[in-house]
Amino acid sequence: MGTCDIVTEANISSGPESNTTGITAFSMPSWQLALWATAYLALVLVAVTGNAIVIWIILAHRRMRTVTNYFIVNLALADLCMAAFNAAFNFVYASHNIWYFGRAFCYFQNLFPITAMFVSIYSMTAIAADRYMAIVHPFQPRLSAPSTKAVIAGIWLVALALASPQCFYSTVTMDQGATKCVVAWPEDSGGKTLLLYHLVVIALIYFLPLAVMFVAYSVIGLTLWRRAVPGHQAHGANLRHLQAMKKFVKTMVLVVLTFAICWLPYHLYFILGSFQEDIYCHKFIQQVYLALFWLAMSSTMYNPIIYCCLNHRFRSGFRLAFRCCPWVTPTKEDKLELTPTTSLSTRVNRCHTKETLFMAGDTAPSEATSGEAGRPQDGSGLWFGYGLLAPTKTHVEI
């Protein structure tokens, strides 16, 4: 980047940096800084609190410890770390254009938050793949507990490998009396190393996983939409089942679209900057970056909200987590939702419904592997738990 670069020298969240530095005189009024600080503080509080509660709901309740939910824990942990270690510190650096946090933390900021971002996206992709196998190929063997842990470990290792170049070339420099945390890329003609790394990273952390999730969820949606009980009209329980399937597809589309919308402007910002560096010389670019970075970081706080709004078990978990608040009153139903049940009739009687609901995600990963060979095992406590009672009839829990 050129000397007008205001926020990309430590581009802590996704990427590519320049091998030049420059002091920037950009500043903003105190009232404007206070507004941005309030917006970022609210983001961090919501994201950290929401994702911490999601992790607690799953790990503290045996009924929620399923294969898919372990991926959700991984996703929540990554989002929590990204909000706590990336959003706040990068906001301070972007708003002041001075690095206050030392050399060691400069290395850390160019490794761990980027790793967390990669883990977040890859965890979403793993969830999509798990849902694809559970719904499109329900009789294929499912992931065991050791396999799930191996996949999660693999995600972290790949993420660390992708983030390591930025950490390796990170350094702290002095630029006209101002301390900068920069990524000093090797000298090359025309900045090809920077551009190549930038394009590869964006492809791997955005376009590729987004394409995989789009294909997976499209096939899942088509499979659910076409799957119907033969010989019966859509009324009563069948109609409710059809409505549940539609809600399931809409939820998946919402998750993918939220991710895509939050991150697309941010990536376009850096793609444009790679080809037209003079855009960073405009005074308004500081406000543009702060807005785009807030939008990208806000993706870390939406998932807990989606879980709470669209899944009754997570909603019960959130009520239990906030039971100390005077306006939140958990019920016995909330506790029962997170307590393992021993019979299907108990669930049906408690819900006072004639519908037959089944959720194979009630078993933990270790228990799921001990079932019959070829038996469909669904590890979902979130995605409207799906399973088969018979080869000709499907059930979706809402």
Curated annotation (Swiss-Prot):
Parts of the chain on the Cytoplasmic side: 57-69, 130-149, 219-251, 311-398
Compartments (UniProt record): Cell membrane
Gene3D superfamilies per UniProt: Rhodopsin 7-helix transmembrane proteins
List of glycosylated residues: N11, N19
GO MF terms held by the record: substance K receptor activity; tachykinin receptor activity
Biological processes annotated in GO: intestine smooth muscle contraction; muscle contraction; negative regulation of luteinizing hormone secretion; operant conditioning; positive regulation of acetylcholine secretion, neurotransmission; positive regulation of flagellated sperm motility; positive regulation of monoatomic ion transport; positive regulation of smooth muscle contraction
Family stated for the protein in its record: Belongs to the G-protein coupled receptor 1 family.
Protein name: Substance-K receptor
